Regions:
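Intrinsically disordered, low-complexity polar/charged tails and linkers
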Residues: 1-184, 190-192, 198-223
Length: 223
């Protein structure tokens, strides 16, 4: 995160409605040993801007916002490209924002406030506020780097079928739902795992820490 301090003149407004989906990437040692620290790869967020004049005039916003594009006939939102933090924002007339390309959740928050600050500077007669920021879903990606091995998903399913759904003829991935966790994991024979359904990075890490040693027991030589 590049920015941690904000001047008192431009302190963040109160927060009230933002949702985010975060992608996490885990790096694993070559022998599929201990997982190194998780790294947030991409955040997709949605936020709501409250404005004293609603709906927002997108033509006006496009004319005053730098690095923005607006083609009403093709898409009903202004596209704003921020440099600091580096991300892309879609702003709709309803006040809804969709943010993509953020590196972490705090960057997503800063991007929301950056858009509002820019609008305040260029629309001095309007009251603007971002109104609750929370993570709604986290998507994690894990690659075990099995090299000359694969995961025996058929055996994994036979021995853990209470927690699994697996129909190889319809989809190559095994769906794993831990009994005591809301996290859902999609496991592929190649060693790639997609983790979703968590509300925090800690939940993702706990779920993966529980599954990781179990998965290693189902490695077999690649045929």
């Amino acid at each position: 995160m590049r920015r941690r301090r904000r001047s008192s003149a431009s302190s963040p407004p109160s927060l009230h409605s933002c949702t985010c989906a975060i992608e996490l990437h885990y790096e694993v040692t070559r022998d599929a040993g201990r997982v190194r620290a998780a790294m947030v790869h991409n955040v997709v967020g949605t936020a709501m801007i409250f404005c004293s004049s609603a709906p927002l005039d997108l033509n006006l916003i496009h004319s005053i916002m730098p690095n923005s594009t607006f083609k009403k006939k093709k898409f009903a939102a202004v596209t704003i490209r921020l440099c600091d933090p580096n991300c892309t924002v879609l702003l709709f007339a309803s006040g809804k924002m969709v943010l993509t390309g953020c590196r972490d959740f705090m960057t997503c928050i800063l991007a929301c406030h950056s858009v509002v600050d820019l609008l305040r500077q260029r629309l001095p007669g309007f009251y603007l506020e971002v109104v609750n920021i929370q993570m709604q879903n986290i998507v994690g990606h894990v690659d075990l780097h099995l090299c000359d091995e694969i995961l025996d998903l058929d055996r994994f399913y036979r021995e853990n079928n209470i927690e699994c759904t697996f129909q190889r003829t319809m989809f190559p991935g095994l769906v794993y739902r831990a009994v005591d966790s809301p996290v859902v994991m999609l496991i592929f024979a190649s060693g790639r795992v997609v983790v979703t359904g968590a509300k925090s990075t800690a939940s993702v890490e706990r779920a993966w820490d529980a599954l990781h040693p179990k998965l290693l027991a189902y490695r077999e030589p690649r045929k």
